[in-house]
Amino acid sequence: MSLLEEIAPSVQQVAEAIALAVGVEVEIVDNQLTIVGGTSVYMQRIGEKEESGEIDGNYLYARVLRTGNTEYITDAQNDQTYGITVDAFGSFELAEICTPIKADEHILGIIGLVALNEDQRSILLDKNKNMVKFVEKMAD
């Protein structure tokens, strides 16, 4: 069990607080790509693997886990390295800011700020630099 799974109720509270403060959806995964917390469609997927659990893959979350760098995807549907943009519930991911959760230089997981509609996408695009700084501070 990962550290984030051990504190899953707190992880879920953080996801909900970020979503309320920022106005976008939040997905939090651990270092094995297990969804540990989230809002909207991600809450329904807690316990499932993101990106099929392929931590050596080339999609967004696997890259962020490997590199430790924040990535900002402005057009998820047309970004071939993003991954699947629609889930079983029919929600389309339009944009995302994804940053690693670090402790003592170890990557514990990822926080993703996700736009599922144009209003949320506008929030991520309009406040790009501030949103990146915000999510990086939350992940520290």
Predicted feature residues:
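Juxtadomain coupling helices with adjacent low-complexity linkers
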Residues: 1-17, 21, 109-140
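Glycine-rich loops and low-complexity Gly/Arg-rich segments
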Residues: 51-54, 60-62, 96-100, 122-123, ...
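Structured interaction and signal-relay segments at domain junctions
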Residues: 2-93
